[in-house]
């Protein structure tokens, strides 16, 4: 089981009321994330678990390709290193606490310098050698869905408690494309939440129709450039006008699948790795209940 950790703790923060630690610090995201993990482990009983981390939430190599990529979330540009992301003031202090608690539990936290959690997930899900559940609220990861390799997404767009199990049939029914076409579909459609403009005038229906007819983005572009190809003049013009965008967007949308990651140490712990540290963290931050719940679930897994 691969967790898109930031996607989960952001949802925990915005989906839960303020919960204060003894010192008055809000810890709702910490508690919510721990309860999410408890629920998922209890329901799915994974043998391995990794909390995948954004070591760089807006990698420079993606920004160099499309400068609007996540630009609306930047609060401070940093010349060397990741830009500062807009994060609520009462969520920001909770992130290091999350790291400490996960470490005390012995739950693997996996990141890669210069890459997003999506890229870590893409790499770990590829050739995993076992069934993989990807837990995320990010639709981009639908591109990883693969029935043959038993890779599916547990989509938490509507909340972890109401997550949807995304397989190839789900993607087909929802968007009218195959999971293997989803990255091209997302490239054509665009995604305002990530600052990806898409092809102007091409929405989900047109993107699905084009992929159904031509198969992939390369063939769509080839048809648009071929006067003899059967393509409506208006669509042809839109694809042609987006040529510069389409030259680079596929590399931004596609998640990495070949990062040099250490795959050892991903087994689900059956007990906390550092009980003393975990107890101290639980006392300091008022986390007794969620820590006890997750400890109990791990012992039963």
Regions found by a protein language model. Name each.
Residues 1-135, 139-161, 165-167, 247-248, ...:
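Noncatalytic, basic helical substrate-engagement surface that gates or grips nucleic-acid strands
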Residues 47-50, 148, 165-301:
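Non-catalytic nucleic-acid-binding/docking modules located in mid-to-C-terminal regions
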């Amino acid at each position: 089981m691969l967790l898109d950790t930031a996607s989960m703790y952001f949802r925990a923060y915005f989906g839960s009321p303020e919960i204060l630690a003894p010192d008055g610090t809000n810890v709702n995201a910490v508690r919510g994330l721990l309860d999410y993990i408890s629920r998922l482990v209890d329901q799915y009983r994974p043998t391995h678990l990794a909390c995948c981390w954004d070591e760089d939430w807006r990698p420079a190599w993606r920004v160099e390709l499309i400068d609007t990529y996540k630009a609306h979330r930047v609060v401070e540009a940093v010349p060397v290193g990741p830009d500062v992301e807009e994060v609520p003031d009462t969520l920001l202090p909770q992130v290091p606490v999350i790291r400490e608690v996960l470490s005390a539990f012995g739950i693997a936290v996996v990141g890669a310098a210069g890459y997003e959690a999506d890229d870590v997930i893409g790499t770990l899900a590829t050739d995993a050698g076992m069934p993989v559940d990807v837990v995320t609220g990010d639709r981009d990861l639908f591109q990883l869905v693969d029935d043959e390799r038993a890779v599916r997404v547990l989509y938490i767009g509507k909340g972890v408690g109401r997550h949807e199990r995304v397989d190839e049939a789900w993607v087909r029914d929802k968007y009218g494309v195959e999971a293997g076409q989803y990255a091209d579909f997302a490239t054509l459609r665009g995604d305002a939440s990530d600052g990806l403009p898409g092809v102007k005038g091409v929405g989900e229906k047109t993107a699905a129709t084009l992929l159904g007819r031509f198969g992939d983005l390369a063939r769509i572009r080839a048809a648009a450039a071929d006067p003899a190809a059967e393509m409506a003049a208006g669509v042809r013009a839109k694809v042609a006008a987006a040529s510069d965008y389409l030259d680079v967007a596929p590399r931004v949308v596609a998640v990495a699948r070949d990062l040099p990651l250490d795959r050892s140490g991903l087994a689900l712990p059956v007990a906390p790795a550092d009980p003393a540290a975990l107890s101290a963290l639980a006392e300091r931050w008022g986390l007794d209940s969620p820590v006890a719940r997750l400890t109990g679930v791990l012992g039963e897994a």
